[in-house]
Amino acid sequence: MEKLLIICMLLISVLVATSQSQTDPETFLRCLVREGSNPQVFISDVTYIPSNSSFTTVLRRRIPNLRFDKPTTPKPIAIITPTTWSHISPVLACARLFPVQVRIRSGGHDFEGLSYTSTAPFFLIDLLNFKSVDVNLTEGTAWVDTGATLGELYYKIAEKSNVLGFPAGLCTTLGVGGHISGGGYGTMMRKYGLSVDNVVGSRIIDSNGNTYFDRMSMGEELFWAVRGGGAASFGIVMGYKIRLVPVPEKVTVFSVGKTVGEGAVDLIMKWQNFSHSTDRNLFVKLTLTLVNGAKPGEKKVLATFIGMNLGGFDKTLNVMNRDFPELKLKKTDCTEMRWIDSVLFWAGYPVGTPTSVLLNPTVTKKLFMKRKSDYVKRPVSRTGLGLILKKLVELEKVEMNWNPYGGRMGEIPSSRTPFPHRGGNLFNIEYIIDWSEAGDNVEKKYLALANEFYRFMTPYVSSNPREAFLNYRDIDIGSSGNSTYEEGKIYGAKYFKDNFERLVDIKTKFDEINFWRNEQSIPVRK
């Protein structure tokens, strides 16, 4: 018995030593020396391990969510910031030899930090050096690298044309890679659909380092999957070829806020019927936030109707007076501007801000953040709305964005791309909780508030499954530490509905060993 115990202890010590050596940064660097065609330049210029003085700076550069920027947050074994696509093959060759995961970071806006952290040992490939945007006015298209931000993309388009744009997100520091691969919506989705509905080509690298430079070489199945199915489950998308869309020389934006005492309830009730059925050139978003009341410590809900119409003052007022006269929109509430300037408006910049600010990929104010999402298929009743507004005041910290669907969104079949939330949806809800105070107990409190409000909203939103939007990633709806099919189906059905099974089949075909995985990746079928 004593001899058996000694043998077991020796075996365990050997296994531990082997595991530690396989996840040691220096061992990884030696592997790169073997695999890299020009290892000296490769290692010194684009690879960072914890002993490098720049490691922390490089890691934190694209972490906007302070929840995942703490001393206790798991850090990568190494960060690779390739400057050419040929740098990636040796990284993948070494990664296949190590018992580790690979995370791909575009802009770092994954709300659960899955693009740059992991509970398992991992390498991080950061695409921040890939930010080329090549606009082709003759074709009306552009090739955009996945490390570019939406702001950089918008700026480059407007640099070439005042009458072309692209339907994508409001936050200009979002990385193109994560945004498009999750669906990507913005103020023109009722007119032109999502970002993925306007992608016509892609380039991708698989786990073996093979590069597919166009749609034909990768095939229609893989091309379908990386347009809304979460590209990080299938490989490293190098770039997307996008179709640019016509925009008028002038668009009109407006923002009108009303409290309950100023008639907000009636306006919200009308908004639920108007926003998805009005002219598709018009997008009117509703935000529900808290403001101070007249008495000390009193809080009340402010409903803000923020809109953009693809047209000038007259067209905007005509449509609003016809379809939403209750808001009593006036010309003085509106501002005419170029489409590129509306990008700044939606991003929260003051009118007149130079467009060059879009070239700054840095998040100016970092916060602790939690996001959740829902889909609404029938109008919330007046009674239900009253309860929702009351709950917002009770919890104090939760805010809501209601984003209208309809128009083009209702015409595209749910199976056209992996993003399934099409016809039948009135609007999408984004739940927002941001805070600045540090501390584990503070974080637990706010996460509990988010979950409490999410449970409270159950009667008013979709069910079986309760649908969710991948770009508002929420680990609470399900996760899989082992990327199993059974666990993956729990969150997969919510993000992708019936499209989940097709994604699993494609994943199994193109990544049978499940090399590309995270806590909410597409699993393989076993």
Swiss-Prot record:
Cofactor or coenzyme needed: FAD
Stored Gene3D superfamilies: 3.30.465.10, 3.40.462.20, Uridine Diphospho-n-acetylenolpyruvylglucosamine Reductase, domain 2
Localization per Swiss-Prot or TrEMBL: Secreted, Cell wall
Signal peptide: 1-21
One Pfam family, short name: BBE
Modification after translation (UniProt): The FAD cofactor is bound via a bicovalent 6-S-cysteinyl, 8alpha-N1-histidyl FAD linkage.
Keyword terms: Cell wall, Disulfide bond, FAD, Flavoprotein, Glycoprotein, Nucleotide-binding, Oxidoreductase, Secreted, Signal
Boundaries of every FAD-binding PCMH-type domain copy: 72-247
SUPFAM superfamilies membership: FAD-binding/transporter-associated domain-like (SSF56176)
Cofactor: record remark: Binds 1 FAD per subunit in a bicovalent manner.
Chief subcellular location: secreted
InterPro entries assigned to the protein according to its UniProt record, in alphabetical order: BBE, FAD-bd_PCMH, FAD-bd_PCMH-like_sf, FAD-bd_PCMH_sub1, FAD-bd_PCMH_sub2, Oxid_FAD_bind_N
GO molecular function: FAD binding; oxidoreductase activity
Enzyme Commission code(s) on record: 1.1.1.-
6-(S-cysteinyl)-8alpha-(pros-histidyl)-FAD (His-Cys) crosslink location in chain: H109-C171
Top-level taxon in the UniProt lineage: Eukaryota
Keyword Zinc-finger: no
Residues glycosylated per entry: N52, N136, N273, N482
Disulfide topology: C31-C94
Family under the similarity heading: Belongs to the oxygen-dependent FAD-linked oxidoreductase family.
Record-linked PANTHER family: OS08G0158400 PROTEIN (PTHR32448)
Protein name: Berberine bridge enzyme-like 11
Organism: Arabidopsis thaliana
